[in-house]
């Protein structure tokens, strides 16, 4: 059996943010030293009730990765409808490298409308069908970024590479897999930093 710790960083008692983060670090250190399998951090924004203390679980996981040796680092969850899918895929891949492969990826659609309205209007929870389509497209792009050497995507919400983008980097050697050698328009996007195991 594997046991993980759900570390929902909250601030019900209105402590200083430094104290809140130090407490989360202490919990992570304890779990690492006592052979817990994983620790999981949440994502919340604009929450005056006390749950706003973890707006970016990847940054928290990066800090914990530098302080621990064995424990796996999870996000419960990355609200992927709020983020650019390529940027999020890169950040998760970078964390996987920094932690030496200890990342557990959790993704979700969000639960608070006030978060969606201020971070990505397309993710508005009043339109659940649209939110679900955005979630599915974002996850598809992230999976492409992690598993394909080169990729392109054209969907309802995102198009990569951007239409009519012209590559003008003189130091890059010509590569027709990457760019149309006649027009210099990108054929694909490259964001691979690591191969994330999808299961």
Task: Mark where each language-model region is.
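Glycine-rich "substrate-gating" loop/helix at the edge of Rossmann-like oxidoreductase active sites
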Residues: 48-53, 78-83, 127-130
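Structural preference for beta-strand elements that scaffold enzyme active sites
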Residues: 2-4, 38, 70-77, 102-106, ...
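Internal, glycine-rich beta/alpha segment that forms the wall or movable "lid"
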Residues: 84-199
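N-terminal beta1-alpha1-beta2 module of alpha/beta enzyme domains
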Residues: 1-67, 71-72
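A cross-domain feature marking catalytic cores of carbohydrate-active enzymes
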Residues: 5-9, 43, 75-77, 107-109, ...
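Active-site mouth loops of central-metabolism enzymes
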Residues: 7-21, 78-86, 185-194
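Low-complexity, flexible helical/coil segments
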Residues: 36-43, 72-80, 108-114, 140-146
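Short, flexible coil/linker segments at or flanking structured domains
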Residues: 24-27, 61, 71, 76, ...
């Amino acid at each position: 059996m594997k046991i993980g710790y759900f570390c929902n960083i909250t601030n019900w008692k209105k402590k200083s943010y430094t104290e809140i983060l130090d407490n989360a670090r202490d919990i992570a250190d304890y779990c690492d030293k006592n052979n817990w399998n994983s620790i999981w951090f949440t994502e919340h924004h604009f929450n005056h009730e006390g749950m706003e203390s973890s707006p970016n679980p990847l940054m928290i996981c990066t800090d914990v990765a530098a302080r621990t040796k064995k424990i796996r680092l999870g996000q419960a969850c990355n609200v992927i409808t709020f983020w650019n899918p390529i940027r999020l895929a890169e950040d998760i891949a970078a964390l996987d490298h920094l932690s030496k492969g200890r990342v557990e990826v959790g993704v979700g659609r969000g639960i608070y409308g006030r978060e969606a309205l201020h971070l990505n209007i397309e993710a508005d929870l009043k339109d659940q069908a649209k939110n679900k389509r955005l979630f599915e497209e974002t996850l598809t792009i992230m999976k492409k970024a992690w598993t394909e050497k080169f990729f392109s995507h054209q969907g309802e919400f995102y198009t990569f590479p951007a239409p009519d983008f012209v590559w003008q980097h003189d130091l890059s050697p010509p590569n027709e897999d990457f760019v149309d050698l006649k027009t210099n328009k990108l054929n694909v996007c490259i964001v691979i930093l690591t191969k994330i195991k999808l299961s």
